[in-house]
């Protein structure tokens, strides 16, 4: 299924000249004669649109991946944005670049981005660099019995020790989780225009939807479709998942898609807690309608509580990746050819989540348990209801299984 993007209205922000900060800032000569900046990045290496760290020249100017991807999407799709403030003077910096698409595109052009340089064909992107230094040190305390199989009898004393094998296996598994997470975000056009997948902003940035602008149903359906596509793409890019029999891959994806979608929606701050699709229906005297009202109210309340718990814990990207793996690898799923392998992957995911939580949140000894307790709440709203609410308008009567299979094959 190919969905066409819908240009979303920007949030209302206080009008301010985007160049005011740059005009008022006086640069002082730096060690390399390039001037210094409070961000610690040389001005010549900053994104000329938002001031974030530049990843090189894009379409004629130094720009970050976020702004270059936004410009490419806008030009290729001939998107037309409207500044809701109306003045066309919204601030465009690292903190506010996602708030007004019209002003962001305007600043891209003013900064010198060349529309003619945007190629019609899809250009390959360089493989993202994954930093795993911290994970290397975290494997020191990893329980080998859960991470690596026992060494066979008669192993040469010069061969790898069980502990070194455990470290290598654990390191590889965590690397594959994060690489899959990165690959699912490499092409910004696979995600909604208002979800900056290359951003280094906090885990829960300001939602692209605000209470001052309507949370349009078309926008929610569009974003939902893209989040589901990202979830499928994440699974496809997970080497340990691809190593399973193809039938097992399909069965696991059909079983877990709704949980993967909800995790992605929470991670990228889709406003599920205020989504009009989840608003309880109007009360009715009929008993059946009253029952549906009660169920819808319960689902909405549980979802709001779940989102609040995720935000209270400030779940980080690595934890999200591990939690996605936990909901994907369910050995109890019926029809699996190799449930033992799936169970081993589930154990790996749990060990990685535990070790990461202990290493990065040592002051929260119960954090791992709290993260695990979040997962059952994702299944409170059934997959059938999520399909009805978020995807029925987009896919019509097409079975979700067929949609997932098409996404997976393509």
Swiss-Prot record:
Residues 118-140 have a biased composition (Polar residues). A zinc finger (NR C4-type) spans 47-67, 83-108. Residues 44-120 bind DNA. There is a cross-link at residues 185, 330, 337 (Glycyl lysine isopeptide (Lys-Gly) (interchain with G-Cter in SUMO)). Residues 153-162 have a biased composition (Low complexity). Belongs to the nuclear hormone receptor family. NR2 subfamily. This is Photoreceptor-specific nuclear receptor. It comes from Homo sapiens (Human). The lineage of its organism: Eukaryota, Metazoa, Chordata, Craniata, Vertebrata. The gene is NR2E3.
